[in-house]
Amino acid sequence: MQRGFEELADTLGKLVDRPDEVALVVAVGLASAVQRRQRGVAYHSDRGTGTVAARTMRRADGRIEVIIESGFLTEVDAYGQGRFTPAGQPQLSRRGLAQMRKTIIHEAQHATMHQRNSGYDQFEVGGHAGDYPRWDYAVAAKILDEYRAEWNAAQHDSRRPPSVNDVLDVLGHLGSELAAADARYQAEPDPAAVATVMEGVYNACAAYWTWMAYWVAQFRGNQILVGAEIQNLNLWKRYVGSTWEGLIQILDEVPIEDLGAPEAKLRQAVARVAHHWVPQSLHQTGFRHVVTTGGEAFYIDDHDFPSERS
């Protein structure tokens, strides 16, 4: 296992500007490690169709920690139990190490953006929250952050465009989560339940939007956007539709080759995603979230949330 950790640390160090300011942290549990560093903020590593393997965080002193989940590196048997070496040490999963290396390459881009003062923290999410429906600016900043990191990661390592199964996994899970949120609200449709259903919808969409950012990054600069086999999927038509082209139009204009891109251009792009694309995507999935003179209003416009793989 030690050799695997050293390989990952070496990969990380080669991809950031100032390796001495970046530490690789191997955590027994990613969620608890993040929460210890971010007191009072809920964090769950279960995300969409899987589990988050890593998180990059800037410390108060300016140093950066890339935290990874150690369980991804352990070989397991058919029953999900960890395998051990004759010496009683956890057995390293070579497949897990290869996948974690891809994750490290992605997280290194986040670390570099932090070092060049152009990462998520620089978007001043809190200062812009009042200009948009709750969470829209924050999720827009997240979309842009993940898009830039994934595109640059692809320059260091091969990234394949999404397959039909990849898309069905993500959109099927999205449909299930939206249906569950709607069902909880319909079972008890009182004013207090509005905040709950809104949170459930945003949580479901956040994982989906992250995948959209990855996919757009993988297709950047290509004339062929997605194949007909994906565009013709019922779930794609239902949840994505024209929002795919809309997100591409915005993100294609974002300067990404330099991870220290001008702050003004990045904030302009975030504002466009928050103002135009997030509401468009919510509407496509069946919801509206608007700011009125009396406050915020959240509407459910569709109660059909398919999840069947078709």
Regions found by a protein language model. Name each.
Residues V28-L30, S70-F72, Q109, N117:
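Short, flexible loop/turn elements at secondary-structure junctions
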Residues A31-D46:
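Extended, Lys/Arg-enriched charged tracts that mediate electrostatic binding to polyanionic substrates
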Residues I104-M113:
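Active-site His/Glu-centered metal-binding helix of metallohydrolases
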Residues A42-R101, H114, E308-S310:
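Active-site scaffold of zinc-dependent metalloenzymes
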Residues M1-V26:
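Zn2+-dependent metallopeptidase catalytic core
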Residues W151-A180:
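Short helix/loop segments within enzyme catalytic domains
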Residues R94-Q99, H114-E146:
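Post-HEXXH active-site segment of zinc metalloproteases
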